[in-house]
A protein has these predicted regions:
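Beta-sheet-dominated scaffold domains
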Residues: 1-169
């Protein structure tokens, strides 16, 4: 299936050819705030909705209730950052089962920028806050079995996360 994210709705394209393609609604009341937050994470799709981080499975199965939001434990951080962030970036680190989301505000210095690390555990999700990363883009690369977590900044530099404390590793 192909999911189609809109600002206020989510649809699913099903079928295998032009003769049986069909677009069906997943929800007509919740959408995705920013496409850069959509990531495959732990066998599901995670995205930033207006009420925090959501999974497609939770949104589909539960409907449009708050139960579909996985970030309830840290909702105050999302509430403080969703409204006035100028951009969002996210990255998944599969071998650590982590989803990281970064909130960028044009008026804030890089060292005050906040983000959230979401870790998938057997019994749910755990969260921690990260500060000081203001990425313009993010990615992971597997090189000789090693996972490199990278982000580009707004000055044009590429930084490596997970090594050292300056991101220059």
């Amino acid at each position: 299936s192909l999911f189609i994210f809109c600002e206020n709705r989510i649809f699913k394209l099903t079928g295998s050819s032009t003769s049986d393609f069909s677009v069906v609604p997943v929800t007509r009341n919740i959408g995705c705030i920013n496409g850069d937050t959509i990531q495959e994470f732990g066998g599901d799709l995670v995205f930033l909705g207006p009420d925090g981080l959501r999974t497609i499975a939770g949104t589909q199965n539960i409907g449009d209730t708050e139960l579909g939001t996985i970030s309830r434990n840290v909702q105050s951080i999302f509430d403080a950052n969703i409204k006035d962030s100028s951009s969002f970036e996210s990255v998944v680190i599969q071998d650590k089962t982590q989803y990281r989301i970064f909130f960028t505000k044009d008026s804030k210095a890089a060292n005050t920028t906040r983000g959230i690390i979401c870790v998938m555990k057997q019994d749910g999700f755990e969260f921690s806050e990260i500060r000081g990363i203001r990425p313009s883009c993010t990615d992971t690369v597997v090189q000789a079995g090693n996972v490199l977590v990278l982000h580009g900044d707004f000055s044009g530099f590429i930084h490596r996360q997970e090594k050292g404390n300056t991101f220059d590793g």
